Amino acid sequence: MTMAATSHDKPVETAAPSTPRQPNRTALLLAPGVLWMLLFLVAPILMMVYVSFWTQTTFKIEPTLTLSSWITFFSSDTYLGALWTTIRIWLIVLVSTLLVGYPAALFVGLFVKNKTLSTALLVLCVIPFWTSFLIRVLAWRPMLGKEGAINMILMKIGLITQPIEVLLFSELSVIIGMTQIYCVFMVGPIAFMLGRIDGSVIEAAQDLGAGFWRIFRTIILPLSMPGVVVGAIFVSVMVLGEFATSAALSGRKVNLLGNIIVTQVGSLKWAFAAVAGVVLTILMGAVVAAMLRVVDLRKEL
């Protein structure tokens, strides 16, 4: 008996039609943004660092590298005092905006069920920004003065017998002004995150017997932390770079690093101004980096 050998033919593989190589679309999409960052962020920072090592004389600046401006900065009580004042006021304003902004965001983002009303309330928070920044700052002067509205009201209701002089032209007035101006930057991100919380989760916790504070501690606060971090970054960057509010509301009694930079630039002392700018940039970068370690925004948002 003979066996017929059968052969199994392998399928013939046909080559895919060749297509002309296209340029990397991702690189093309990133190129404008990267170029913009290099020209308007990286290059100015590098130039500022470079100028901070130039030789500063009384009437001019020479491109001769030296550490004299850095030594002057860290050996001067004026500069170090301004650095400490900047950090102190930033911490106080950050806490005050959080204490004022979180309850407002909680009401707008969670308790107000009507989306139209919630949006309208957020718009009301933004309305002051339709006016000039300087007008919003100077508007506090008639409010905080010795014969201002706050002192008059407190005297009318009998809480005080003499005007409170510390309300204006002091560090307190700067803190009050900054808190009011920048509070909206804390309210917005927190309200956005609170608005994303599924109401059924809170209802389930209530059905299981959880009270408000336990729900807040275990559900609301953790889910709103990305908004808190984003708001804290917004407030921190703007407060650390402040100079106008302190100049207008403190009568130049409060010196921030921003005020030092403005003064040095006005005096044509570019090296000293650059040193203060580098220190301020490092401080801002450290603050933002520390806050980003609290919450991974790429996963949470």
Positions of predicted regions on the chain:
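Interhelical loop and adjacent transmembrane-helix boundary motif
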Residues: 11, 15-25, 57, 70-78, ...
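C-terminal transmembrane helix and the adjacent membrane-cytosol boundary/short C-terminal tail
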Residues: 2-11, 108, 191-202, 206, ...
